[in-house]
Amino acid sequence: MPSASTRRRSRALLALTALVAALLAGPGAAQAQTQTPPATPKADCGPGSRPETGLQGRVSPEDHASGRAAQGFTCNTEMVGQYRVPNTIGTVGGFKVERYVDAAGHDCAYYDTTLLYPTNLLDQEGGVNVMDMTDPENPRLTARLVTGAMNTPHESVVVSQKRGLVAAVAGNPGTQAGIIDIYDISKDCRQPELRSSTPMGFLGHESGISPDGNTFYSASPAGQTLVAVDISNPTLPIPISFFRIDSHGLSISNDGRRAYVAGTGSGLRILDTTQVQERAPNAQMSEVSRLTWPTMSIPQNAIPVTIGGRRYVMEIDEFGTLSKVGAARMIDISDEKKPKVVGDMRLEVHQPQNFDAIRNDNGAQNGLQGYAGHYCNVPSRVDPGIVACSFILSGLRVFDVRDPTRPREIAYFNAPVDPRILPAAGIVPSPSNWAMSSPSFVPERGEIWYSDGLSGFYAVRVTNGRWPFRDSGGAGDCLRSATLGFKLHRIEGTRVVRVEATVNGKRRLRQTGRDIRRVTLRNMKRAGRLTVRIVATHNTGSKVVSTRTWNGCKKGKPRVRRIPRPR
């Protein structure tokens, strides 16, 4: 049994977390009722599935009473392997699952066990677990990282694929002194080597890392701080820039010059990080734009992606159960100064009209649990195809985003619910699931890895051909967006005054204007071959003819030809 002091610490931490969530929560259900987008279309569950029995995402009291919840719910998924802790007292999963393959070919997973630190210690779990995934059917624990930050990383565990580093900053549901731990995993990912543990993050809670692996960003929404730390020498981290912002999760653009920040109370914020990336003296970050949306609860995470040549940010909000569920969305940033929401990923349990029906479900009234979102991730930043999200009580959900304006659910996995030793102890919620982690992917095997706070780590395979999508030359499942935008090729010192566009030889657009810079073609066929020819006539009479081709979702190189003004 846990000691009295441990129980007191756990209850105090839970109270702190609840207070933070309450302070950041948005308006109530009345406003959400009139502004909530519709639920995403349900997945069509194929052979071998154990589908949900009612509302999309729901685990009802009847499901628990009948033993159905104990079997778990699957739709076009199957469990490949697991590292579970049965009959848990505290939490044994957490917020991040990361994957890395080292130079020797070892395949590893890293996940924190600290959803409600220090309750994980009650189950003899500690810090960040290192798993050998060479045989995904039998995940093998090879190490535990328990240094200052890794022992209580909150939402900050990140991996640099380029440099082979795993890093974190110490955090908790509020904020904590920003100790940054950096480990080298490039040689043998199964046995990380500590390179440094230093108090260079100022305050901790969340984090980001530049794709080149040279800059770690320590984020504290409660402390309103974002600190860029140079880790080019992982043994000697150096803070190089400070920005005042309510930064929750963030991602850095591939060139390192933009940060996409989920602000807990301020929505999506796009920051210019060029000076940080270039290591300018006294480097500064500045805001490019920000965006809020009517259903916003607590923005959690933002990731830039390119789909069909167009730029988007995938964003998810956390919490808001039975009130204002933020869930997830696709945001068009083709004009980064004017971002706009173009598609949503929501379940039926997130809809206000269903709140009365689900109110008494296990965990539904817990402000730190409930039917809501927490983390999403993508398998690739370029044409990712899917977004996978942890939706807490509803488990792991997988969405097709090849058309980001019309996401649709294609699969889900909600783990079997275990009994709990101390369901009424007030330390952790009653028997139910608590899927909060950012997942990772093995696209070549169709696997998604995630953790559940109350049972542990799972490797899940998507089945029935739902993902990876078959690329059959454009005639099958590899689909492009139905809306295509084009930035016009311009001759220096001139203006485009007339545009004509043909699609597969048929005219689709004719537009005139004083200075046309972009054109958009809508309601395009998403499959098959596509040839778009755009003729841009300039005010001097010269023309630029550009031809662009697609084969399914695969885009060919544009061909551009200039036609001089007739004499």
Question: Where do the protein language model's features map onto the residues?
Answer:
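Secretory targeting and sorting signals
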Residues: 5-32
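Polybasic, low-complexity, intrinsically disordered segments
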Residues: 30-35, 464-567
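Short amphipathic alpha-helical segments with coiled-coil-like heptad repeat character
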Residues: 4, 85-87, 509-510, 516
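Intrinsically disordered, low-complexity segments enriched in Ser/Pro/Gly/Ala and basic residues
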Residues: 2-4, 9, 541, 545
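N-terminal start and proteolytic maturation junction detector
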Residues: 21-23, 49-52, 536
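Short, surface-exposed linear segments at secondary-structure transitions and domain or protein termini
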Residues: 1, 150-154, 352-355, 420-421, ...
